[in-house]
Structure formats: C-alpha cells, structure tokens
Amino acid sequence: MQDKYLPSAVEQAAQQHWQAIDAYRVPEHATGPDGKEKPKFYACSMLPYPSGKLHMGHVRNYTINDVMARYLRMNGNNVLMPMGWDAFGMPAENAALNNGVAPAAWTYDNIAYMKKQMQSMGLAIDWSREVATCSPDYYRWNQWLFLKMLEKGIAYRKTGTVNWDPVDQTVLANEQVIDGRGWRSGAIVEKREIPMYYLRITDYAEELLGDLDGLGWPERVKIMQQNWIGKSVGVRFAFKHDIEGDDGQLINDGKLYVFTTRADTIMGVTFCAVAAEHPLATHAAANNPELAAFIDECKHGSVMEADMATMEKKGMPTGLQVTHPLTGEQVDVWVGNYVLMSYGDGAVMGVPAHDERDFAFANKYKLPIRQVIDVKGQPYSTEAWQEWYGDKENGVCIESGKYNGLGYLAAVEAIAADLGAMGLGEKKITWRLRDWGISRQRYWGTPIPLIHCDSCGVVPVPEQDLPVVLPEDLVPDGTGNPLNKDPRFLQCSCPSCGKPARRETDTMDTFIDSCWYYMRYTCPDAATMVDARNDYWMPMDQYIGGIEHAILHLLYARFWTKVMRDLGLVKFDEPFTNLLTQGMVLNETFYREDAAGKKTWYNPADVDVQTDDRGRPVGATLKADGQPVVIGGVEKMSKSKNNGIDPQALIDQHGADTARLFVMFAAPPEQQLEWSGSGVEGASRFLRRVWNYGFANAAAVRDGAGAAPTADDADLRREIHGVLKQANYDYQRIQYNTVVSATMKMLNALEDAKNASPVARRECFGILLRVLYPVVPHITHGLWDALGYATQYGDLLDAPWPQVDEGALVRTEIEMVLQINGKVRGSVTVPADADRAAIETAAAASETVAKFAEGKAPKKIVVVPGRLVNVVL
C-alpha cells in the first residue's frame, strides 16, 4: 500500500479490476447468495447528445445515477445502469457545414471520446447494452412502429406550416430564425404549407393527464405537463354572418366559431380576432392592400407559443362584422397576430373588460371596453388592468340581461343552454395539446419509411425491407436536404406496382429516438422491437435528468409507451415510475462590453477575483492583461457565457473521485450546485485524509479481524453506528450531500479515537469505506483490498451493506447539565437508567456543588430527565 494517495494510480487499478471481472454486466433474474432472486431496480440517466465532450452537468447527472446504482447493488438489488447516445439531430449537420465532414463521422468520433470520459469517471455502466440512435439496428424500429401507427390511423398526413429559407432552399427550425431571417443566409424567412406526418397524441390526452397522479415525479414537473396538455372545459359557439366568398357561398356556412372558458363574459364581447390564415381574413384582404400586407407580416412571424405570449400584440380591422348570438349586436372582426389558425377554430372573442390580453389590445386600438362582471366593492377603471377584472371565483354578472346576478358556474350553464337551444353552441372540452408533427426536412435523422409513386400514391415500405438505411457519407452544404440530391437513396421501385418511384426524404423528429431507447437497453440484441427482457426491467424504477425535459421528451415517451401497450408490445402504462430532476451547475461569469454593447465573456479560470474581508467579490481583472472585467454574477455553466469547467481537466488534476465527491457534497441532487474551486480542494483534502488514516492504521486494521470490541470502544462505536443510521436514511431519500457529511463525521470520530482497539478501528473504518464507496468507488476499492476486507467480505462491489448495531447506540451513562441556583456550573455523569433520586444524590455529591455549597445542604434539587439538574442552595 502506497503511503501517499495517488488518484491516477488508484483509479487506474480499480478500473482495470472492474474491467477484468466484467463487473457491470447485469443479467436478468439474478440470484443472491441465499439462492433467492434479487429484486430488480432499473436506474437510468437521460441519454446524452454526443456533442464532443462531457460537461459538468453530465458529471453530476451520471454520478447521481452511479451512487444510486452502487448503493442499491450492495443492498441486494439486481441493478441496471445502461448508457447510450441520442445521436441524430441538427448539431451534427451544423458541424458538418462548419467542418466539411459527414455528420456520421463527427458523431461516431464524439461518441468514442465521450465514452472514454465516462469510463474514466468509474461509472457502473453495463456497456454491453449500449445503444446509439443513429444505428440502423435501432432506428429500424422507429420505422416499424411508425408503419404500425399508420395502419392504426395513429399516424396521418396533413399540411403544416414551416419556416422556409428561400436562399438555402431549406426548412428552418424556429430557433434558426433570428429576427425573421435565416441564421445562415440572412434571407427573410417565409411561412410555407407543406405535407407533413403527425401522430395523434391528442387521442391520449385524457390518459396522459390522468396518469400523472400515480407517478413519483416532482410536483412542478407534473404541473408543467398538466399545463402543456391543457384541459379546458368551456363553450364553443358561433357568431353568425352573411359574408359570401368568391363562389357565392357563405364562408364557413355563415358562422364564426370561437371557444371560451369564460362564457359568463360573453355579453362583454366588443370585437373578434381571427388568424391571418382564416378564410374571413383572406376574403377581407382581397381588396385591401394594407390588410394584405399586415397578414403577410403575421405569416412571417413565429408560430411558437412561447414567442406568441411575449411578442407585441398587433391587429388590423377587416371591415367585416359578425352578429352576437345573444344580443344581435354587430361585432367588428379584426386580424390579430396573436391568433393561431392551428389552435381551435382560428378565432377568439374579445372581452377587454375581463381578459388582460384583450384589455391591452382594446386600449391600444381604442376599442370599446364593456364591464359585465362585478366583484362587490371594487371600482372598475379602463385606465389600468387589475387582477380582479378576471376573477371568476367572486364575480357576478352585471349588464348581462337575464344573466345578471349569476356567478361563474351558473352563468356558464345558463348561457351554454341558451346557445345550445339556438343551435349555435355547446359545452366542450378542448386541449392545448396538439398532434405531434414528426416530419423534419433534414438529413441526419430516421428516414420516414414511405415511397411516393405516381401511380399508387404514398406507399409504405414493406416490413421485410426495413430498415430504410440513411446514407452516412453525405456532407450537407446548407442548400436543402442532401437526400433530395442523392439518387442512391432517392430512387427506388414502388412496392405495389414495381414502377420507378421516389423515397420520402423527410426524416423523423429526433424526439422519437428518445421515446423508447430505455426499453432497447433492456434487450439491445432483440430480433423484435422489445422482448421478454423488457417485461423484466420495465417500467423503469428511477429516471434522472434535467428539468428542461419536463414537457416534450417525457410527454412523448409516455405517449409512445401507451401506443406500444395498445399494440401489445408492452404490459405497462407508464415508462418512468420515479423521476429525479437534478439541479443545474452554476459558475461565476465575467465579461467586458465594447462601445457597441457587444459582450466578450471570459472563463473564470482566466480571471483574478478580489474579495473583501467576508470573502465577497468586489472586483476582478483578466490575468492576461491585468485590466478590469465586469462581474456578471452566477449563472448556469454554458458555452455562451464561457463559464464552464472542463471535467477532464478536473479529473486529470484531482482524480475522478474528487470530482464525484464535490458534485455530490456541494448541494442536494435536486437543487442548483454552485461551482467552487475551494470546494474541490476540500474534497481532495478529505480523500487524502481517508487514505492517510488507512495507511497509518493499516496494521491495526488488519490485526482487528475476528476479535470482539472492548468496553473502551463504546463511544467510537456509538458515534459510527449512529451516523450510519442517518446515512442509511439519507441514501434512501437520495440526499447524497448529507451522506458525504456523514462520512466526514465518521472520519473525524476515527481520528479522534486514539485509544480505540484494532477491532473497533477495523469495524468502524470498514463501515466508513462502505458508506463512502458509492460516491468515491476507486479509493474505497483500493483501501478495501489493501486492508484485507475483501478476504473477509468479498469484492467491495457486492460487499454486504453494514448493519446498524442498535446495541452500540445504547448509552450506559449520560452527561447532564449541572446548574447551581439556575446558572450552568458544569455537568454530572449518571447511569443512563438512573431514577430521579439517584440523579439528585449524584448531583449533591458532585465536587462542583460542594465547592459552591460551602458545607450547606441543598434547599431543593430540580431534575429535568435526560437534560439537566438544578441545585438550589
């Protein structure tokens, strides 16, 4: 055993050992030493995109998973911790454009490097189950299930709106549109309607909403999904009109439909707004160039809901009017840039008195504001919006004719009934959730397995011809999808008639790849999409990932699972029983700003920080030139702010165990973690102390095998077993920061117990090593072997978890505070089971009392059991 802790040597030796014994290959239905089948536990981190290098967020995520897996394995579980790569997507195409390499080559190189980094972290990953979503063996099942959905009507084709770059001749993602222009060409982006494929996720909306209740997920994630699914109970009704189209027929049968959850405010409607693509807008713009220009502007805007919520609300009158169904009044129709044709009927009613958005819109364009809801004692003013204007809990109808005095529920019921009797409306449930458009006009993704034939139309690729393999040698040049220009891929024969035909060149949304990879981990070599091994492991017991995936990935994975269930492929309703969303890793930011307002960000490693007496930063200078930089505050580590820490550099300098220990100790897993260089140094010092204790006490620890502890060891054993009890609790509730704190207390106790017997040192240090092992497996493995524990208990991987000795926690004596005339003067030691009389006797006989009593007998002795004794003289 080396006297000095050398992380690189210790970690290399441990990793070579684990590799030699294939330590992390996990079978199904494993049995324990007693011959009984172990309970399974499937713990999985969200698979990474192979961007090139791990970042500290990866390190934290995977270490949380690894700690959990190792702890559960030592406690008798059959634990699966797999890993794979979310390998399709736009970043690979962008890298290809920048570097002139095929996305496939870039992706596979990155996978190889990142896998090597993960292995250097000592993660307990079963690499025999590795999956890359860009592998034809994987994405063939994306294609297969898509065809099954097509057969069942779950997948269908319709036109959808996309961002079109007319210069690069390509479709852009929303994030590639910057101020209305293409990110690469700078061309003004157009909105185009093109045929796309959709999945009917809305058919599962009710189940997706209801099943959230049974999941062990953070409440805020459930709420985010609930809001995204967006169940609304309201009334859909029509404003009638007599507006005719060019064909002489009434547009939309003379009805403008809207949906509202606030039917009680219907008498306050002063305008209606329609989407730019609405037939009434198109009709009105035919002879109105100004309106046509505004509609064109709307069509060039974003269709993302997040953007719609924050952008300036604009509108223009159409000159058209519709008839209010209950009052008969004429209501002006406007085109609004905030109304989407893809949502509901592409039209909304405007009630500015009781809707904040409508209130702002009406004030901007000087539209009437009519109050029809009153909350007692609240004066109404059109000058500024007040929260009570939209209050449906306490408001009652006013200025609403027969509905006056009705509260929200009663008014909605009465108005819905009247509209229904007129044949103009009905109560209805609507959903914010929309069907999932999966077509992407991009190259690096799963090919959609369809063929276009001039004679037969759209024809599915026969199952025996799957997978439709994506050519991996294409290099995008930014001018459209390269699949459209590759005859090897494009040209084929129609499976139905045999005539020349063309393959579909759209690829699938990459969220499809991440919908079910965790199932393929369970059976990566299966000849079918999944097999019986998936039934054994799924549903997953613990999923770990960032809060940024709370909606789309998790929602799509839940939907995909339910489709697989309905197709008879799986036997469960939900894929992830429990979810942990780890907090972000933060770091300081520093920058300089030029005259034009452009900021240049500097990495914290390149900056010297000046602090005050309390350690608070008061200034900073760049090391390169000594000139000041601005302290930008603490933010999430990111490339854009240049405040990341390279995990590989950290591992090279301090070792993987130090990196693991710091990210586990610095904060609870679900909370944000603020980077601290001094914290890393502290973690490194602690590990050196652990090693030094093992080296200094090696002979005693080895000699302590087989003997029994002595009475003199009681204090040490009581401390260690008490801390062990708390550590067990903290492991179970995934509070790994306090687990690390527990091991620090254990080490302090061991170092302080100078006279402990060899047997106590062996027992207590062995407990420390096992409790610490899931967090820092390399150093603990090295000490475990060097000190002879492996001979007694076997490999630390599967060593039995230490059991709390309840007997060791029992105190034979307790120390009570001693007061004299109400003032603390010392303490008195009494047997733990001493009664009141015995405590009084011990206190009266103490030297401290004798000193203050000066021969006088106590007047009274007050005992607070277990805490203090007060002697009144």
From Swiss-Prot:
Its EC number is 6.1.1.4. It holds the Pfam family tRNA-synt_1_2. ATP binds at residue 639. GO terms for biological process: leucyl-tRNA aminoacylation. The keyword Repressor does not apply. InterPro entries: aa-tRNA-synth_I_CS, aa-tRNA-synth_Ia, Leu-tRNA-ligase, Leu_tRNA-synth_edit, M/V/L/I-tRNA-synth_anticd-bd, Rossmann-like_a/b/a_fold, tRNAsynth_Ia_anticodon-bd, Val/Leu/Ile-tRNA-synth_edit. Its main location: cytoplasm. One of its GO terms (molecular function) is ATP binding. Keywords: Aminoacyl-tRNA synthetase, ATP-binding, Cytoplasm, Ligase, Nucleotide-binding, Protein biosynthesis. A motif ('HIGH' region) lies at residues 48-58. It comes from the Bacteria. It is found in: Cytoplasm. A motif ('KMSKS' region) lies at residues 636-640. One of its GO terms (cellular component) is cytosol. The keyword Nucleus does not apply. It catalyses: tRNA(Leu) + L-leucine + ATP = L-leucyl-tRNA(Leu) + AMP + diphosphate. HAMAP family: Leu_tRNA_synth_B (MF_00049_B). Belongs to the class-I aminoacyl-tRNA synthetase family. This is Leucine--tRNA ligase.
